Protein backbone atom coordinates (compact mmCIF):
# COMPACT_ATOMS: atom_id res chain seq x y z
CA UNK A 1 0.00 0.00 0.00
CA UNK A 2 1.24 3.50 -0.80
CA UNK A 3 2.23 5.97 1.87
CA UNK A 4 1.32 9.63 2.10
CA UNK A 5 3.44 12.47 3.38
CA UNK A 6 1.26 15.06 5.11
CA UNK A 7 2.75 18.41 6.12
CA UNK A 8 0.72 20.29 8.70
CA UNK A 9 0.79 23.55 10.62
CA UNK A 10 -0.06 23.23 14.32
CA UNK A 11 -0.73 26.35 16.38
CA UNK A 12 -0.51 26.26 20.18
CA UNK A 13 -3.10 27.81 22.50
CA UNK A 14 -0.62 30.50 23.55
CA UNK A 15 2.98 31.54 24.05
CA UNK A 16 3.17 29.68 27.38
CA UNK A 17 2.75 26.26 25.69
CA UNK A 18 6.01 24.25 25.48
CA UNK A 19 6.03 23.12 21.84
CA UNK A 20 8.40 20.19 22.44
CA UNK A 21 6.20 18.91 25.26
CA UNK A 22 3.09 19.37 23.09
CA UNK A 23 4.67 17.36 20.26
CA UNK A 24 5.84 14.57 22.60
CA UNK A 25 2.28 14.23 23.90
CA UNK A 26 0.94 14.21 20.35
CA UNK A 27 3.53 11.62 19.27
CA UNK A 28 2.45 9.33 22.10
CA UNK A 29 -1.17 9.49 20.95
CA UNK A 30 -0.51 8.45 17.34
CA UNK A 31 -1.82 5.04 16.30
CA UNK A 32 -2.94 3.08 13.29
CA UNK A 33 0.33 3.31 11.39
CA UNK A 34 0.64 7.11 11.57
CA UNK A 35 4.22 8.22 12.19
CA UNK A 36 5.65 11.64 13.04
CA UNK A 37 8.58 12.01 10.64
CA UNK A 38 9.93 15.34 11.91
CA UNK A 39 8.88 18.77 13.07
CA UNK A 40 10.28 22.27 13.34
CA UNK A 41 9.29 25.36 15.29
CA UNK A 42 8.60 28.41 13.13
CA UNK A 43 7.95 32.02 14.26
CA UNK A 44 4.48 33.41 13.66
CA UNK A 45 4.06 36.79 15.40
CA UNK A 46 4.63 38.59 18.69
CA UNK A 47 6.64 35.76 20.25
CA UNK A 48 4.19 33.07 19.17
CA UNK A 49 5.62 30.07 17.31
CA UNK A 50 3.87 27.27 15.45
CA UNK A 51 4.97 23.75 14.59
CA UNK A 52 5.42 22.61 11.01
CA UNK A 53 5.25 18.81 11.17
CA UNK A 54 5.56 15.96 8.68
CA UNK A 55 3.53 12.81 9.18
CA UNK A 56 3.65 9.55 7.23
CA UNK A 57 0.43 7.59 6.92
CA UNK A 58 -1.01 4.78 4.87
CA UNK A 59 -3.08 5.71 1.82
CA UNK A 60 -6.33 4.28 3.12
CA UNK A 61 -9.68 5.67 4.14
CA UNK A 62 -9.88 7.40 7.50
CA UNK A 63 -6.16 7.97 8.06
CA UNK A 64 -6.27 11.74 7.54
CA UNK A 65 -9.31 12.07 9.79
CA UNK A 66 -7.56 9.99 12.48
CA UNK A 67 -4.50 12.24 12.26
CA UNK A 68 -6.59 15.39 12.57
CA UNK A 69 -8.52 14.00 15.56
CA UNK A 70 -5.28 13.03 17.32
CA UNK A 71 -3.65 16.41 16.72
CA UNK A 72 -6.72 18.42 17.76
CA UNK A 73 -7.08 16.39 20.98
CA UNK A 74 -3.43 16.86 22.02
CA UNK A 75 -2.82 19.09 25.04
CA UNK A 76 -1.92 22.65 24.07
CA UNK A 77 -3.12 22.50 20.45
CA UNK A 78 -5.33 25.33 19.23
CA UNK A 79 -5.43 25.03 15.42
CA UNK A 80 -4.52 22.43 12.79
CA UNK A 81 -4.07 23.09 9.07
CA UNK A 82 -2.92 20.77 6.28
CA UNK A 83 -0.30 22.60 4.20
CA UNK A 84 0.56 19.83 1.75
CA UNK A 85 -0.19 16.18 1.08
CA UNK A 86 1.52 13.96 -1.47
CA UNK A 87 2.15 10.35 -2.20
CA UNK A 88 5.64 9.22 -1.20
CA UNK A 89 7.80 7.75 -3.93
CA UNK A 90 10.37 5.03 -3.40
CA UNK A 91 13.36 7.37 -3.69
CA UNK A 92 11.96 10.12 -1.46
CA UNK A 93 14.23 11.07 1.45
Swiss-Prot record:
Keywords per UniProt: Elongation factor, Protein biosynthesis
Residues making up the signal peptide according to the UniProt record: none
Single GO molecular function: translation elongation factor activity
Statement: the UniProt record of this protein carries the keyword Protein biosynthesis: yes
Keyword Protein biosynthesis among record annotations: yes
InterPro entries: eEF-1beta-like_sf, EF1B_bsu/dsu_GNE, Transl_elong_EF1B/ribsomal_bS6, Transl_elong_EF1B_B_arc
Function: Promotes the exchange of GDP for GTP in EF-1-alpha/GDP, thus allowing the regeneration of EF-1-alpha/GTP that could then be used to form the ternary complex EF-1-alpha/GTP/AAtRNA.
Annotated NCBIfam families: PRK00435.1
Family recorded in the similarity comment: Belongs to the EF-1-beta/EF-1-delta family.
Protein name as annotated: Elongation factor 1-beta
UniProt gene name: ef1b
Amino acid sequence: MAQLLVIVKILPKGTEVDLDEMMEGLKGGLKGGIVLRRYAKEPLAFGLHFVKAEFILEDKEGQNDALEATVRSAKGVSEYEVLNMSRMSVDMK
